[in-house]
Amino acid sequence: MEIEEIGRCYGTMRGEIMGENRKIYAALLGAGTVGSGVYKLAGMQEEDICLKTGAQLEIKKILVRNPGKLREGIPQELFTDSWQEILEDPEIQIVIEVMGGIEPARTYVEEAMKAGKQVVTANKDLLAEYGDPLFEIATENKCDLQFEAAVAGAIPIIRPLRQSLAGSQLTEIMGIVNGTTNYILTKMSEEGMGFRKLWIWLRDWVMRRQIPQRMWKAMMRDARSPLWHPSLLVPE
């Protein structure tokens, strides 16, 4: 262990205290815009993650519908269309679910935790509909179900609420908690657009963009869930 000059935050590195850095394997479920971004970010931040945690994070497998499709910046050998291949791999300790929707995401998350794997999800719909039973499964299997990326545009708010402010009594939470809400309020405040007129404009905008009804409903209800569910704010 080496202590460097005063003021250097990385002078003493956890990895050095723990000995040789261990490798942690993860699997990504989904390789769309979010999934590809997670993979690339994990690579860019590899050294920082190692310095701060003493562990090397490696994406071992990526679950997709079409493994033969070329995706820029991601090695082809990582892709698989077999969930069982990921589930039954003892080296994979973390499953990162970024595929969206309810099914098969719900089944995969449940099975991963029952197999003892830790889960990270950015799936608002899934948590809004099945948050309680999923957290029960996580508790029963002594697994983590991390969901910060699914709340308020990934603003780091859940961990401070559950840990840093665990001894404080929360009486109120105020804020603009998603991009859709922020966009609507900006139209109303800066352009003076009334809500009725705005609603008609939004409806036409959705039709022009051919946004699926399911996605539009999720965008509109995003501000109501899952941040506001009481069980998600109880200190650990």
Residues of each region from the PLM?
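A short hydrophobic/small-residue beta-strand
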Residues: 119-120
